[in-house]
């Protein structure tokens, strides 16, 4: 078994999971949404449009990691 097995595979990401940008550490919290991109509160990360990016550093969605509450 490699230390990198399943690296980058998102598991256990629910509609309320908070995710953090791996570049600038900005947190996307579904409860808050994203005022900059006009994303309504209550919008889960999976429902964000593909073109959505970090409001702080412009990193793509793929750079976000699930964090524990």
From Swiss-Prot:
<keyword id="KW-0249">Electron transport</keyword>
<feature type="binding site">
    <location>
        <position position="54"/>
    </location>
    <ligand>
        <name>Fe cation</name>
    </ligand>
</feature>
<feature type="binding site">
    <location>
        <position position="57"/>
    </location>
    <ligand>
        <name>Fe cation</name>
    </ligand>
</feature>
<keyword id="KW-0408">Iron</keyword>
<protein>
    <recommendedName>
        <fullName>Probable rubredoxin HupI</fullName>
    </recommendedName>
</protein>
<feature type="binding site">
    <location>
        <position position="24"/>
    </location>
    <ligand>
        <name>Fe cation</name>
    </ligand>
</feature>
<dbReference type="InterPro" id="IPR024934">
    <property type="entry name" value="Rubredoxin-like_dom"/>
</dbReference>
<dbReference type="InterPro" id="IPR024935">
    <property type="entry name" value="Rubredoxin_dom"/>
</dbReference>
<feature type="domain" description="Rubredoxin-like">
    <location>
        <begin position="16"/>
        <end position="67"/>
    </location>
</feature>
<dbReference type="GO" id="GO:0005506">
    <property type="term" value="F:iron ion binding"/>
</dbReference>
<comment type="function">
    <text>Could be an electron transport intermediate in hydrogen oxidation.</text>
</comment>
<dbReference type="InterPro" id="IPR050526">
    <property type="entry name" value="Rubredoxin_ET"/>
</dbReference>
<feature type="binding site">
    <location>
        <position position="21"/>
    </location>
    <ligand>
        <name>Fe cation</name>
    </ligand>
</feature>
<comment type="similarity">
    <text>Belongs to the rubredoxin family.</text>
</comment>
<keyword id="KW-0479">Metal-binding</keyword>
<dbReference type="InterPro" id="IPR018527">
    <property type="entry name" value="Rubredoxin_Fe_BS"/>
</dbReference>
<keyword id="KW-0813">Transport</keyword>
<dbReference type="Pfam" id="PF00301">
    <property type="entry name" value="Rubredoxin"/>
</dbReference>
